[in-house]
């Protein structure tokens, strides 16, 4: 259910972009993100830090987009977020003993520290690739192509990364059982 609620801002952005323009779409993204944040906080009786950080980025970059009437801000938001996530996973991989992924999934998946480290490196590289890809699309393609890439391309890339992780974990778990 949370996944569906969190999809509302993206769907809203896409629909308003198709019928209006990036500025109306950015405003709808801001409103839908705030609405979704409030609803999920009430339904799940807690404030998710990830959702709060995302909301702050959406509001700040959405406001800048509207205030300066410049779509670059909303486009670069994606690159900045993915780059920061990549850095967090890289720092976690290199310097921190308590692996971030292990902390997140500690009640769900039991893996060795070495495997958690490899997964952190994988996600660091993945988010860096997404940041670089978004930058490339911003610089060399039309706004419409960027919107399509943001909505569908990055979603598909993320789904592929999750599937790869799932197969990797399944392979490791089945190897341990045998």
Swiss-Prot record:
GO cellular component: plasma membrane
Alphabetical list of Pfam families matching this protein: IspA
The entry's keywords: Cell membrane, Membrane, Transmembrane, Transmembrane helix
Similarity annotation: Belongs to the YciB family.
Membrane topology annotation: Multi-pass membrane protein
Function description: Plays a role in cell envelope biogenesis, maintenance of cell envelope integrity and membrane homeostasis.
The gene coding this protein: yciB
Keyword Cell membrane: yes
Transmembrane segments: 22-42, 52-72, 76-96, 121-141, 151-171
Localization: Cell membrane
Main location: membrane
PANTHER family per the UniProt record, alphabetical: INNER MEMBRANE-SPANNING PROTEIN YCIB, INTRACELLULAR SEPTATION PROTEIN A-RELATED
Protein name: Membrane-spanning protein YciB
